[in-house]
UniProtKB/Swiss-Prot annotation:
Domain of life: Bacteria
UniProt region (Pyrophosphorylase), positions on chain: 1-226
Family: In the N-terminal section; belongs to the N-acetylglucosamine-1-phosphate uridyltransferase family. In the C-terminal section; belongs to the transferase hexapeptide repeat family.
EC id: 2.7.7.23, 2.3.1.157
Protein name listed in UniProt: Bifunctional protein GlmU
Protein's UniProt keywords contain Nucleotidyltransferase: yes
Catalyzed reactions: alpha-D-glucosamine 1-phosphate + acetyl-CoA = N-acetyl-alpha-D-glucosamine 1-phosphate + CoA + H(+); N-acetyl-alpha-D-glucosamine 1-phosphate + UTP + H(+) = UDP-N-acetyl-alpha-D-glucosamine + diphosphate
Organism, as annotated: Synechococcus elongatus (strain ATCC 33912 / PCC 7942 / FACHB-805)
One cellular component (GO) term of this entry: membrane
Protein location: Cytoplasm
Length: 452
């Protein structure tokens, strides 16, 4: 059995933000989201989040999770004091307690799994996660006895110059045998530089204490300011990019590309520079995406090309070509082998297979059939100032350049709309619709000038 305590009560003053530190986003998730997600491999009995500064906002962000118990730390008097708040909640509990910090978002689930399983195999009263750092400044140092058992943890600010030379640091992640920790928590003191209750002091009262060293020291990096937040984002993206390149995806200029963990990519996909893939985006096989494109929560079929475009909450079927400079949004659905070209916006519309919308058009609340050709400058005028109205264009119909379709309106199959027309009435199948003023010519016209 293992219970979990996530320490999330700090003010995070170095973030210089009105937002609680654990609610700052690292990619697609908050810091607290990521810490909670790392618990997935574990069989957790109870999960506590200890809150303090702006605790109500932290609670609100996870109000949908009934498996999380929030515990208030009204005064921020140190990590030991935070865990003391669990005493009334875990009275009589006989399992282990895993303690994490809410601002250490890069820990992998398998690392926590190794820590907990190692602790339970060893029979130790406490097991801590450690790392070897080339620049350990700011981290507590871990000191072991001749048998390699942990005997002391000294916070960086309390270390002597000689003690600061020790590269083995405390990651701030612990697994305790709860009955043992419960017995010593009341003994913690504030006899230190910060006059706080350090959880690390409990180590001096417990025996035996073991350690598990993390293989990748980047996992333990904490976030205290915006610089560290940016550095953690870089590390996270390196992980994701490496994963996809090893899986058969080509990333041209990888450091200019960002990909959320929730994105799924097929094989032989090429991602060009300055492309950003977010949310629950799925991209099929043999696609070329970018450069300079943003795709969010969208499904892209096999063989699709996207250039310099913004796509959100939309679907694109196989072998279609999007862009450059297209904008698809609001549940746009593009069929197979379509072309959505330069400066075209498609919003809440369905475009049938092999339909071309090549340039300078807006399709809103529209349904287009198959093999439709939309001329340059065609606009669906879908909004009357109060409500949105639909436009329907049947199979194989064509709209001439600079046409305006005033919704609600239905264009039948095999219809031709003459260039420059403003259509505000339904057009039957097979018809030619012309709705423009007749051209007149005045020969020998003298253009007026301002000269008298």
């Amino acid at each position: 059995m293992v219970a979990v305590a996530i320490l999330a009560a700090g003010k995070g003053t170095r973030m210089k933000s009105q937002l609680p530190k654990v609610l700052h986003r690292l990619g697609s998730q908050t810091l607290l989201d990521r810490v909670l997600a790392s618990l997935t491999p574990l069989n957790v009995d109870r999960c506590f989040v200890i809150v303090g500064y702006q605790g109500d906002r932290v609670r609100e962000s996870w109000a949908h999770r009934t498996d999380i118990e929030f515990v208030e730390q009204t005064q921020q008097l140190g990590t030991g004091h935070a865990v003391q708040q669990l005493l009334p909640h875990l009275k009589g509990y006989q399992g282990d307690l895993l303690v994490l910090n809410g601002d250490v978002p890069l820990l992998r689930g398998e690392t926590l799994e190794a820590l907990v399983s190692g602790h339970q195999r060893s029979g130790a009263a406490a097991t801590l996660l450690t790392a070897q750092l080339n620049q350990p400044k700011g981290y507590g140092r871990v000191f072991c006895d001749a048998t390699s058992r942990v005997c002391e943890i000294i916070e960086d600010r309390d270390c002597t110059p000689a003690q600061r030379q020790n590269p083995r640091v405390n990651a701030g992640v612990y697994c305790f045998r709860w009955p043992d920790l419960e017995a010593v928590l009341p003994n913690l003191s504030t006899a230190n530089d910060q006059q706080e209750y350090y959880l690390t002091e409990a180590i001096t009262y417990l025996d035996p204490v073991s350690a598990v060293e993390v293989a990748d020291s980047q996992e333990i990096l904490g976030i205290n300011d915006r610089l560290q937040l940016a550095d953690s984002f870089r590390i996270l993206q390196e992980r994701i990019r490496q994963q996809w390149m090893l899986a058969g995806v080509t990333l041209v200029d990888p450091t200019s590309i960002t990909i959320d963990e929730t994105v799924q990519l097929g094989t032989d996909v090429v991602i060009e520079p300055q492309t950003h893939l977010r949310g629950n985006t799925v991209i099929g096989n043999n696609c070329s995406i970018g450069p300079n494109s943003l795709i969010t929560n969208s499904q892209i079929g096999d063989g699709v090309t996207v250039q310099m475009s913004v796509i959100s909450d939309s679907t694109i079927a196989a072998n279609s070509k999007i862009g450059p400079f297209a904008h698809l949004r609001g549940a746009a659905a593009i069929g197979e082998a379509c072309r959505i070209g330069n400066f075209v916006e498609v919003k809440k519309s369905t475009v049938g297979d092999r339909t071309n919308v090549a340039h300078l058009s807006y399709l809103g609340d529209a349904t287009l059939g198959q093999r439709v050709n939309v001329g340059a400058g065609t606009i669906t005028a879908n909004y009357d100032g109060v409500s949105k109205h639909p436009t329907v264009i049947g199979d194989r119909s064509k709209t001439g350049a600079n046409s305006v379709l005033v919704a609600p309106v239905t264009i039948g199959q095999d219809v031709t709309i003459a260039a420059g027309s403003t259509i505000n009435k339904d057009v039957p199948d097979g018809a030619l619709a012309i709705a423009r003023s007749r051209q007149t010519i005045h020969e020998n016209w003298s253009t007026p000038t301002t000269e008298q």
